[in-house]
Amino acid sequence: MLYIVRSQYWFYFIAIFVALSLYFSNSIHAQEKTKLPNYVIEQYGEPPAIPTTQNLESIQSAVKVAFIDGVRQSNWGRDQTLALEEIANSKDPRYVWIISDLMRFSSGHQLDMELRDAASKLLQKKIPIENQWGVVTDHLIAWNIPAPPNYLEAKRTIFTTIIPGWDKIFVEGEIDWRHVSWGGVVIDDRKYDTTDERCNCIPAADNPEVSNVKDAAWLKDDDIVFGVEVNGEYRAYPRRIMEVREMVNDTLGGRDLGIPYCTLCGAAQAYFTDQMPEGVKRPILRTSGLLIRSNKVMYDINTYSVFDTFLGKAVTGPLAKKGIKLKQASVVTSTWGAWKKAHPKTTVLKEALALGRDFDFRNNRDSDGPIFPVGNVDPRLSVHEDIIGVITASGKPVAFQRSKAFLALKKGKEIAFENIRLRLAGDGIKAVDANGSDLGSHQAFWFAWSQFYPTTTLWNG
């Protein structure tokens, strides 16, 4: 009998403990008190505190009603409004991440207003009507507000319900889903070597047709190209074409390459996609239609493994589990005239690959900063300053301000940092070691390089 009584008391103890665990969130969920840089506080103010106790079960139920049920049913009614009010009254700014995700797709005045008011209450900030999604998301990133519980589930529901084709993309992995947003286009999910087929996407080009210099009369000498050299073979990828395609799967010098161009961060990169571990097929890279802090998100069409485009590292799927990280070849940003003079036997992509378009994104870039949210930007250089980025042999990221480095090299000065030596190539710049071997450098906007390499060294000239 005593055993039964004690067992009953033990049962009640467990029941009470579980109930309390569901009702209260403890300090584990509190925002880490990591000191923010002064420039972040000056621009965005102090972040709101995250409550250490709250009714998590009730809030999660409200999230389901407002964001999961509402999106799946394509309905925003009284139940959703009341659920959103409950979330706003929680004083927990973590839930603004989900509000931000729905903001990105919202086009209704009433819903926009309700989402803005809820975000404003939780962030303790007045949110402007204009660009409310951008302002909210910039604050979340800059303050490094943690994700709410079960965040990926809610985000996945919003994104995959509204835009088809992302079901295999939104999975757990080494990716910070807080920073993933919609780039305004749908996924390119065409199989390898079918890129002549039309798509309602940013259309990659597989095995693009090329010509020699003589037959490339359509290119002006001052047109910008991205030059790549592999095993003594040279190829120019005109920016006009890359602004349309944004992704090329090619073969040069006997090596397979995947070449993404992120128009938003001014970075063309060249990744080797051959010489994979046994059992791993060549990754065929595509544009997902998603962004991470204004940097395009690419993925492998064979496995739906997502890659960090800037780092070349697989972050989800089978390739992430195998630890795949792609090595880079240098990409030189040069004028066509200087590139062909330096490399008269170069090949170049054919004009037809531009599909008759000429976006000229670069020269129409917003002078006020990135057009998608990026949060705080390292203030050592201006946001859209061009840099040459490279990693040293010791693993240290280094950025060279392109304008200063170019002038120094033109004057015959040597630029060296650890094992890095900068060299002129056409009228662009590439990094090599003391033996002249390629170190996989590329040009990018400062905001992009510094956010993916926050500890980067900046060459001071």
PLM feature spans:
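Boundary at the C-terminal end of the N-terminal hydrophobic targeting segment
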Residues: I28-E32
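A composition/secondary-structure signal for short, hydrophobic, low-basic-content segments
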Residues: I4, S25-S27
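Bacterial N-terminal signal peptides
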Residues: Y12-Y23
